[in-house]
Curated annotation (Swiss-Prot):
It comes from the Eukaryota. Gene3D superfamilies: 3.30.420.100. This is Large ribosomal subunit protein uL18. It comes from Eimeria tenella (Coccidian parasite). Component of the ribosome, a large ribonucleoprotein complex responsible for the synthesis of proteins in the cell. The small ribosomal subunit (SSU) binds messenger RNAs (mRNAs) and translates the encoded message by selecting cognate aminoacyl-transfer RNA (tRNA) molecules. The large subunit (LSU) contains the ribosomal catalytic site termed the peptidyl transferase center (PTC), which catalyzes the formation of peptide bonds, thereby polymerizing the amino acids delivered by tRNAs into a polypeptide chain. The gene is RPL5.
Amino acid sequence: MAFVKAIKNKAYFKRFQVKYRRRREGKTDYAARRRLILQDKNKYNAPKYRFVVRVTNSRVLCQVMYATLQGDRLVCSADSQELTRYGIKVGLTNYSAAYATGLLLARRLLKQKGLADEFKGLEKPSGEEYHIEEVSEERRPFKCVLDVGIVATTVGNRVFGAMKGACDGGLHIPHSNKRFPGFTKGEDGADDSYNPEVHRARIYGLHVAEYMRTLKEEDPERYQAQFSAYIRNKIDPDSIEKMYEEAFQKIRANPDPVKKEAREVKRVRQGAMIKTAKSQYVRNVKLDKETRKERVLKKIQMVADKMAEEE
């Protein structure tokens, strides 16, 4: 079939239909979202939970959500910035932090639902493939499906680290090991292989420790600049594994979020100026009809007096 170039005339623009705003902005893949939220028709009013992972420049966000006609509803969430409470004060966006955030969300959600004692998950991460539904026989675990957004699902991506943390924490998320670090695809008909030790090294931050040692030997100045936060917090390559190991135990001991105290909002009016704790802005007092009428009469009188003086 010959290539036919689209003629962008008046009829083309008249019939043109724009895509959804979030599709135009490159934020949502609606084809993938439709498949994610579509529930079986024989499950009446049963929400389909999604394990949502989003990675920014400064944090890893994990949320469990479900879709409604009015919009998505949040069930539980965890943020890698919370890991500072558990002893992880640096590297809040790496693979290990993503795993810890997923673990924190899983333990928090199960405690919220009253399932924490029944579904404890894998207490000592080993990198081995683990499915909670194969362990529990009496009761079905809390099930979610992974929502990665628009990221490239490459081997070793941090979203799969967060998913691994949630699975080890006791959530049931259907998956395989094909996107975990340590997976190697077989060539020329050979079988695929998976090395859990490589994955375990990523979970405990051993790849960071190895890079720290290498950089310290080869370029000490760059090491001082790149790992300044580690040096400031007195974290050396030999203490990284212990830091994460203790953090995982603390997360299991107390996954509850810290409740923030509601601050008093102080607003003071000084004439037409509103002053708050952070800023100030102008908001004129609304006048009633009688006051406005008096102001108009005064202005008329002022103009009349001025004209009389000039004469």
